[in-house]
């Protein structure tokens, strides 16, 4: 049932093609190097501790997953290391049969022990290892009856198991290397994916080349790929100037127009909804952000509905929504959403109420620093817009923008007042989407520092509820409560616009920029 729901949500996404006409099915060609831009660098190389595209886009081609999402038919789950699987009638056990003869890039064999070691690292990370999604997989126990069989047993019922196992962040590492050093994935690339690691020149490039020992002898088509790390403003000149042919995260409407004005006949455009929102995180360990009225007031000052109309013309920010993607089957209906703090369409009344709430809380003329990434889209416009909205209720915020690693270090340490953060994962499922709204006891990405166990309890309850209608009610209760407490508040959801050179084939856009980035099916028509 969860798969059916996700497919219904994905159906909203539309792909548009602009150029000389849609090509019929082409015969893939081997060879060539795919050059593409990435607008941020990974803070380290560890998939299990990451939430950023800056890691997925360079690193996904180097690793295999147990199973993965099909970019052509999202959210269908297809084999990767697992060639087949069976599900017990009570859905409390999932058994996977691994491909034979799979090798890591160093020539060592990949067996069920490597899958188990990787998932054990996610579920129960050793000291010093960060596992962002450990709460997601807490009910799983991994067993290995033989070298080609992996069994996941559930302690409790769990919704969306196959989709959870298809996470692009669940890279399979070498058990032998993890035993020597559980932290090795942070600084070393050694996977079993279609491309081996060539090199990373910080601030400049990343390169991978075809792995001749890849389990699928017909893949990859490419000889290799090369990434250029650039500022967001350099993507359009980079594509027009021929430095690279693609950027897989997304461009804003103005940039799409610039590209089409200059090179329409050579470009392919994809557009659709995005499983991403920009949100504000209030550090509840610092005053006055420990006061719910202060947090609510700062959310209520922001005109999301007016901002949607204005910002969607110049940025990738567009849709008004709560914790769940607007239009998704489990999200709060708009009629309910507008009753919650920060989502009313009467912005004048909201701002007057917000001023009174701040004064009552002793926070009149509040001043603080807004911590943000130095990535133009959509962080800069989102930060600037929020600061302008707060100014209208007498609040002054200083915009502090940092390089991604420095930003993430500060947020992880709780060294901020308010932060511009994102909520994004590889699918719509609430178990994924609520990860940053939890306490740190349950999720390392609970950056607000709140200790509200009610959210954690509701989270666990929905995760263990198989009945869709019952689960939807729990999710909506959790969403109402989270938005009212306002530890984190969504600003706007994103629109995804991809503009690539039309010679790139085999790449398909999904609602998540984390998916379909292993490049195994990509080829160049040249």
Language model features: what each stretch is:
Residues 37-89, 120, 188-192:
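N-terminal lobe/hinge region of extracytoplasmic solute-binding protein
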Residues 68-72, 166-220, 224, 233-234, ...:
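Gly/Pro-rich hinge or "lid" segments in bacterial periplasmic/extracellular proteins
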Residues 97, 131-177:
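Surface-exposed binding/hinge segments that line
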Residues 202-203, 253, 347, 351-426, ...:
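Ligand/substrate-recognition segments at binding pockets and active sites
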Residues 213-258, 296, 387-388, 396-398:
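Ligand-site clamp/hinge motif
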Residues 318-360, 377-379:
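Structural transition elements
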Residues 347, 396-407, 432-502, 526:
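Extracytoplasmic/peripheral linker and loop segments enriched in polar/acidic and small residues
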Residues 498-526:
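Long beta-strand-rich cores associated with HINT superfamily self-processing modules
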